[in-house]
Each structure stands twice: as structure tokens, then as C-alpha cells.
């Protein structure tokens, strides 16, 4: 029968005898309050004893304490020092975290080459997280030349190792035929496997497939259920997608609520949707300045739809002074950018391009 108090008793005896793993386990108990009263000072003491004795797991845990400020003042440099030692001992999670620190410049000067080195070391040693990160770097050309063959290889290895993010990203590549021949059966399979592990991005992607009838029979009710589950886990894009379908169904107040929640989660398309509501006075009072602010926020997040709307606002003087010549130039630039954008599959995208074309034509004379 499980008994944390007995476990702590034996870990304590092992630690007193100099067993490094017992020290690390005892420290974990003190940190989490398992079988003993929580005591961060005691946890830090035993992590340090174990780490100084050469235990890679304790080195990782000590680094994590410095990173989080558990029992000690937060210190990223100390965290990196212990992650480095743990990584050199072959501890996989230390490799993961050290690579992350180099990638994002946390506690150490940003260095993509070193980040990639440790991701590769971790991946080759069996870390599914490092495999996923390596796949992501190859897919996006971060720190290495873009190579979709390598991306697929590492995503597949990570997904087969149980990494839900890799399952989703691999599914997305099969879904869109990027770096691999489009295969909706495989896409749906990977999305479903990731969703089973509560991956919100995969739930959202499944929702999109059901909404569009892509790889599965079109079923809006099932799509909305997947969106709902994803949104409950914090997936902002799922709230946006729910908002879109509610808007199409004429449930405008509900749509606005989901758009607002998605915008609060930094979904760029949600800012476009909110801007439209304010521009046209849908559910809310018509407010050109607020519409323009929404479009500006979405544009900063990368939304081409917001860029098109913002250019149109400047041309027509919505929410600010009208600037016909400069506005026309911005509209033409936005339209050219829109033609090449990866957002083309987004809801409402073609309608936005057509609106901008009409606006340009009406104001060129």
C-alpha cells in the first residue's frame, strides 16, 4: 500500500548513507510536501548535496529551483550552470532546458548554434521534447537551414515517442501537404492521438477539419464540440473559430464574447473580427477609433486581414484623418501582400480581398 511517510523514512536513511538518488528523492518530497511537511530549505539542501555528488537529476532540480525561485532567489545564471552540469552528465531534461536557455537567451547569451547542439544531443539520447524542438527548428529554418525532410523525421520520432505537440505539428504538415504529400487520413490520425493527450491545438485542428469537411464528413456540431474543448484549455484560435461560426449563424452577442476572449489570448484574427464589429456597430456602439485600434493590434500580431482593413481605414478616414493618396498606396501594398499570404485559407479572407479591391476602384478616380 502506498505510504509516503514510509518512503520518506527510507529516503532519509539512504541519504544519510550517501546514496545520491535517495538524496534527490528526499529533496523532491520536501519540495512537494509528500510524506513530510513542505520545506523548501531542506529540499534545496538535499538537491545541492546530491548534485555536488554527481547526480544529474539533482543538478536539473537544483537548476529548476534557481529558475523558479523555489527556496532561493531566482537566478537564471545559476540555473544555466546546473543545467549545463546535468547535461554534461547525460541528463535529458537538463539538455532540454539548457537548449531552451540558449535559444531564448535566458541566463546566458542567446546562441542558436548551441541551442541546436543540445537539442540534437537530447534528441539522439531519446528525449521526445528535444526531437520535437529539433523538428520545429528544421521546419521553420531557425538556427539551421530549413529542411522539411529532417523536420518530418524528427517530428515523427517525437510523435512516436509520445510528444503531443509533435503529433499535432506532424498532423498539420500532412493536412496541408507541407514537406510531405498531403494525406488526410494520417493528418486526422495524428490530430486524434494528440487530442487524446489533451493537446488544445490538435482539438482546434480537428474542429477545423470537421467544419470544412476536410478528411472527415462535414459536421459543424462535432466541429463546435472540438472548438469548445480546445477553448476550455486556453486555445485562443478555437474561441475565434467558435465566434466565426456563431456570427455566421446570426448569434452575434455570443460571437462577440468569443472574439473578445480570443483577442485577449492574442489571436490576430480575433482583432480583425472585433474591429469589424466596432466599425459597423454590430452588438457594440459604432466606434471608428476603436475599430482602428483593433486593426492596429491585429496587424502588429501579423494579421494580413487587419493590415487590409487598416489601410482601408486610412483611405476612408475611419477612426482618423483621411489620407487619400497615402491610403491608396497602403491599400495597394496590402492587396499585393495579401495575394502571397499564407492566411489565404482563413475565414473571410477572400471577402476581405474583394472589399479592398472595390474600395481601391471606387477611390482611384
Region annotations inferred by a language model:
Residues 204-205, 211, 217, 221, ...:
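Ankyrin-repeat and related helical/solenoid repeat scaffolds used for protein-protein interactions
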Residues 25-32, 59-68, 97-104, 131-140, ...:
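Hydrophobic face of amphipathic alpha-helices that form TPR/SEL1-like repeat modules
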Amino acid at each position: 500500500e502506498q505510504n509516503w511517510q514510509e518512503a520518506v523514512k527510507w529516503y532519509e536513511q539512504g541519504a544519510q548513507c550517501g546514496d545520491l538518488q535517495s538524496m534527490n528523492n528526499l529533496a523532491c518530497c520536501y519540495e512537494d510536501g509528500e510524506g513530510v511537511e513542505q520545506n523548501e530549505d531542506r529540499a534545496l539542501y538535499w538537491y545541492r548535496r546530491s548534485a555536488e555528488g554527481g547526480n544529474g537529476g539533482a543538478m536539473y532540480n537544483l537548476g529548476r529551483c534557481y529558475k523558479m525561485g523555489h527556496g532561493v532567489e531566482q537566478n537564471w545564471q545559476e540555473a544555466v550552470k546546473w543545467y549545463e552540469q546535468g547535461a554534461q552528465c547525460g541528463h535529458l531534461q537538463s539538455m532540454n532546458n539548457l537548449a531552451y536557455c540558449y535559444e531564448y537567451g535566458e541566463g546566458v547569451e542567446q546562441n542558436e548554434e548551441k541551442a541546436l547542439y543540445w537539442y540534437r544531443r537530447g534528441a539522439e539520447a531519446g528525449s521526445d521534447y528535444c526531437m520535437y524542438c529539433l523538428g520545429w527548428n528544421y521546419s521553420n529554418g531557425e538556427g539551421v537551414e530549413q529542411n522539411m525532410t529532417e523536420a518530418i523525421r524528427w517530428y515523427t520520432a517525437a510523435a512516436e515517442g509520445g510528444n503531443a505537440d509533435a503529433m499535432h505539428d506532424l498532423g498539420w504538415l500532412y493536412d496541408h501537404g507541407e514537406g510531405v504529400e498531403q494525406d488526410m487520413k494520417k493528418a486526422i490520425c495524428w490530430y486524434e492521438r494528440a487530442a487524446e493527450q489533451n493537446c488544445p491545438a490538435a482539438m482546434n485542428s480537428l474542429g477545423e477539419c470537421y467544419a470544412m469537411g476536410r478528411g472527415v464528413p462535414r459536421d459543424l456540431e462535432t466541429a463546435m464540440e472540438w472548438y469548445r474543448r480546445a477553448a476550455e484549455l486556453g486555445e485562443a484560435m478555437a474561441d475565434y473559430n467558435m465566434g466565426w461560426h456563431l456570427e455566421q449563424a446570426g448569434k452575434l452577442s455570443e460571437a462577440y464574447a468569443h472574439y473578445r476572449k480570443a483577442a485577449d489570448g492574442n489571436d490576430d484574427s480575433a482583432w480583425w473580427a472585433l474591429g469589424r464589429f466596432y466599425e459597423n456597430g454590430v452588438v457594440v456602439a459604432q466606434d471608428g477609433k476603436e475599430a482602428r485600434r483593433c486593426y492596429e493590434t491585429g496587424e502588429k500580431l501579423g494579421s494580413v486581414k487587419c493590415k487590409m482593413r487598416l489601410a482601408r481605414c486610412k483611405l476612408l478616414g475611419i477612426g482618423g484623418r483621411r489620407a487619400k493618396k497615402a491610403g491608396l498606396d497602403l491599400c495597394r501594398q496590402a492587396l499585393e501582400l495579401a495575394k502571397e499570404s499564407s492566411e489565404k485559407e482563413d475565414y473571410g479572407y477572400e471577402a476581405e480581398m474583394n472589399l479592398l479591391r472595390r474600395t481601391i476602384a471606387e477611390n482611384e478616380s
